[in-house]
Regions:
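Glycine/tyrosine- and acidic-biased, solvent-exposed loop/turn segments at the edges of beta-strands
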Residues: 15-142
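Sec-dependent N-terminal signal peptides
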Residues: 3-13
Length: 142
């Protein structure tokens, strides 16, 4: 019976994480970072605005020290400012943007959509007026 109990908890111990928080001089939270047992970022990392209300400035996901998955940044009033996805490079050395990234005006309307290919290069760029109409591209592209 003791062996069964130990085996049930072993997977949880292998995935143990440590959460580190840093604070502004004012005492408000600055960041919350999850680390795996090897000391590498693993999980959601959040940075906060400095007025003490736990208002998130940015949040990104990490796996084994590398940014991967969803990234979001927010305005001071909590609206999404930018959002997109990161992926590992083939060599696994660094992370790069992939898919569609969106940026928003402070008022919440869509500002730009940038599409990145599998190599992290921007292949499509659309810019919007606040009323949603597409802005014409400047001569020569972006």
């Amino acid at each position: 019976m003791k062996k069964i109990i130990i085996l049930l908890f072993f997977p949880l111990l292998c995935q143990a994480q440590e959460v580190k928080r840093a604070y502004y001089n004012s005492g408000a939270i600055l960041s919350e970072v999850h680390y795996n047992i090897e000391g590498k970022r693993d999980g959601t990392t959040k940075y906060f605005y400095d007025w003490g209300a736990w208002a998130i400035k940015t949040e990104a996901n990490y796996k084994n020290g590398k940014m991967i998955g969803t990234f979001k940044s927010y305005t001071k009033d909590g609206r999404i400012k930018e959002e997109g996805f990161y992926k590992y490079t083939e060599a696994g050395v660094y992370s790069e943007r992939t898919g569609i990234w969106k940026r928003y005006y402070d008022s919440g309307e869509l500002n730009t959509e940038i599409t990145y290919d599998e190599n992290g290069r921007s292949v499509k760029y659309i810019s919007y007026e606040k009323d949603g109409t597409i802005m014409p591209m400047p001569e020569g592209g972006c």
